[in-house]
């Protein structure tokens, strides 16, 4: 399979950033995208709502179903799955995009924020994927894709920001577990993570401001890699913790200069993403 035309994606989040970029790449093929997101109205510090994202998806050539809801709420998840199936006739892909980030050290991390990261990142990934599995089983080439890193249990990352590390690794463990559990059903489940930081609001506001943004790549590189993953044969392309650049290289892309957030920035000057040595 080399196209997402007519395929239906149910994603968590997607109002902006990486999730929206992936949605727009799929929309260019004529995919259907349902987004479960909280952003019913504009955020004072963040661009985009689930409704503005839907408008962009339609303009790019896809069909959109904006669903206002919270991935922490089981009823909202059930409703999103039912609405997506009702609107588009099925679900081919689940994209676990919604994620909360807080890089605070353990003594500075509030219990509330720790729980939030666990609830959105780990539990949300599990519950949304699980709710969609009965429908994915009927899809021609079903995929689950989570935007989380490979498991790297080194002190460097476990100790840097334990709460966030556990939440992101939890997403990966859920996804790899689903890959094993539903392999016989032909459902692929993989994770995807970049080698460099991506120019998103999270990087701007929480990681490094303008300096790191200028040393990042655009979300288009993530979107192009996700597209490759989601068009692979599900029965054989599964159970992997994939790296964005490796996926593209395996697909014949060797020049990443066009993805630099600031044109002309050499690869050597880009800021490495966390969790990778």
Residue ranges, per PLM feature:
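Conserved Rossmann-fold SDR core element
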Residues: 26, 90-92, 172-175, 182-194, ...
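Catalytic Tyr-X3-Lys loop
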Residues: 100, 107-126, 145, 164, ...
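Catalytic loop of short-chain dehydrogenase/reductase
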Residues: 137, 143-184, 195-198
